[in-house]
């Protein structure tokens, strides 16, 4: 069991963290039929395209600041109960605008939930604003401008998510320059649905501190060596990768070879209930399926805190908390 281990997470999409039970309550609140996306208290999808449709349907059940406060507090409290001391959630102001709530109110609702969870459990958390790749470079640049301007104390990073196979990384370089100049931490989805080349392109054109996923770097030995030498941190999500059939099973997942090659890796849950996982389950799989020792896993957690987009006093407190 890994229940005794402190945990930290750098990669979770907040709408994708919605427990099915909460989605059902929200559906009743707004009189929405969820029979096509939730059956037997589990989300229903078959492939990446239907997963995105299901995800969007669940996200549409959150419509007010209070809804988003509830979502953030629910997820972070669940994490804290599993021994998690730090969490970064990926958030989309574009979604706040799309539903008519507005980006500012969307962020404020999430922030209220984060603060409530911290007051209740002590868990520290931050938000990473994400651009949506398949909406195109201009849309992502506008999101980057918003992130740079907003200056919310809990917004500390920027990500690029969405359909990895649309648009080249180079087309988003301007967006990342905007947020880099604003002092935000940088990470980008790459090396998940697209191959090793997408990780290399991200390193060349975006120069991020971290890569969201990045696991298909394993297809290129020189790239793996580069990741290790440059100290780029991978936000690895094994349960997600297996559910989406990026890899057939945990036995063929490259977390261990990446770790043994000296790449800095961390454990994450991505969209946990959609993939029948949780951060606690990812730690269990690492220990009992992939064979990592407690000290190996502690090292991954320490890496997550070292790579977290937080101020240095907060980082020092979190590192100290690992050994309490």
UniProtKB/Swiss-Prot annotation:
Site feature location: Important for catalytic activity = 213
The UniProt catalytic activity note for this protein reads: adenine + H2O + H(+) = hypoxanthine + NH4(+)
Enzyme Commission number(s) of this protein: 3.5.4.2
> Could you mention a single GO BP entry for this protein?
hypoxanthine salvage
Any GO MF annotation of the entry: zinc ion binding
Membrane-spanning segments: none
Disulfide feature: none
Q: Which domain of life is it from?
A: Bacteria
Annotated residues that bind Zn(2+) are located at 11, 13, 189, 270
- Could you tell me which Pfam families the record lists for this protein? A_deaminase
User: What is written in the cofactor note of this entry?
Assistant: Binds 1 zinc ion per subunit.
Q: What does this protein do?
A: Catalyzes the hydrolytic deamination of adenine to hypoxanthine. Plays an important role in the purine salvage pathway and in nitrogen catabolism.
Provide the family line. Answer: Belongs to the metallo-dependent hydrolases superfamily. Adenosine and AMP deaminases family. Adenine deaminase type 2 subfamily.
PANTHER family found in the cross-reference section: ADENINE DEAMINASE
Name of this chain's protein: Adenine deaminase
Q: Which organism is it from?
A: Sinorhizobium fredii (strain NBRC 101917 / NGR234)
